[in-house]
UniProtKB/Swiss-Prot annotation:
InterPro entries, sorted: AAA+_ATPase, AAA_16, ORC4, ORC4_C, P-loop_NTPase
Protein known as: Origin recognition complex subunit 4
Oligomeric and partner information: Component of ORC, a complex composed of at least 6 subunits: ORC1, ORC2, ORC3, ORC4, ORC5 and ORC6. ORC is regulated in a cell-cycle dependent manner. It is sequentially assembled at the exit from anaphase of mitosis and disassembled as cells enter S phase. Interacts with DBF4. Interacts with POLQ.
Organism name: Homo sapiens (Human)
PANTHER family: ORIGIN RECOGNITION COMPLEX SUBUNIT 4
Binding, ATP: G67, P68, R69, G70, S71, G72, K73, T74
Principal location: nucleus
Keywords on record: ATP-binding, Disease variant, DNA replication, DNA-binding, Dwarfism, Methylation, Nucleotide-binding, Nucleus
Superkingdom, natural source: Eukaryota
Amino acid sequence: MSSRKSKSNSLIHTECLSQVQRILRERFCRQSPHSNLFGVQVQYKHLSELLKRTALHGESNSVLIIGPRGSGKTMLINHALKELMEIEEVSENVLQVHLNGLLQINDKIALKEITRQLNLENVVGDKVFGSFAENLSFLLEALKKGDRTSSCPVIFILDEFDLFAHHKNQTLLYNLFDISQSAQTPIAVIGLTCRLDILELLEKRVKSRFSHRQIHLMNSFGFPQYVKIFKEQLSLPAEFPDKVFAEKWNENVQYLSEDRSVQEVLQKHFNISKNLRSLHMLLMLALNRVTASHPFMTAVDLMEASQLCSMDSKANIVHGLSVLEICLIIAMKHLNDIYEEEPFNFQMVYNEFQKFVQRKAHSVYNFEKPVVMKAFEHLQQLELIKPMERTSGNSQREYQLMKLLLDNTQIMNALQKYPNCPTDVRQWATSSLSWL
């Protein structure tokens, strides 16, 4: 009877943990509008009022949201739109168009996407338009309900705004800003960019039609606020089904936030970047260690997750190389030391390697030249070395100039962790100059 009871308890526990994983992963990955905003309340209020003026009073506006990657630009606009759409008269009337500079790479593709998102494919049909402006005006005209006074407001969100500035003649931006300045259909144009010099990219005619409103997000919070964000991001909501488990989980999160080793981990991440994406990555890796047998996150989980976050991917590749490839990297290291980072070619590396082989009484490392060449090419495929210039068909591979993409510290750290690294190879690496 007791075994049956413990089995049902473990099932409940597993179900609970799967819900925890789902809720927190959703929060970390999607930055859903249900999560809280941190340190951008003033900017949020400004943007929210701007959108309401367009949606409720038919006032056209344009604004740029500027901030580094991961500062919360998308989350800010998503929160503002969510709040706006909760107003009944707005949700039935306002239309949204989301464009991305990485996807809509020219104005023709952008116009097709605008037509699709406004559900006007049937209205456009096979019509032929003289210009981009005429086509866009027709689309917005089609949204009018009856008379000119009851136009349907449209909110345009342009992600990666700086990429739209590279479109030919900036026609899309010109027409959107032109409409926002005129008494046509009420529209709000919201650009999201990480370029501080964005206005310098705009043509004079485009710049003159832009309202010059800018909202800056700079992650200006301090470390105490960062710890508070850590707690809020890990805590379970009040509506979590299992109240007892949620209470225990949140108590554990509170304990973690006060733990000295956890605070050291958070301080390290905070000093590197205030970017909330890096914090979410840290928490995601730590969350992956939570299982039915290990139901609560610990300081060790966060410390190991931090090590994974700061892991050197190039040094990790070195751990999987053959001894011959390691020897070639050491030869390149010595060439860099001797010639002060000057580029090298295969022949120079091969000669350096041969000096090492000749110093040894045994011939364990005595490989044929084509074999060494193959190992050298493999290092190029792994992008541990790169050619200085594009190769021409008739150039000899042995004399093509290369550059090593690892520094001395990375090489030495990788050698320390290299499994069963031969002693003489390690000694060769640590010698101050090559075998001259």
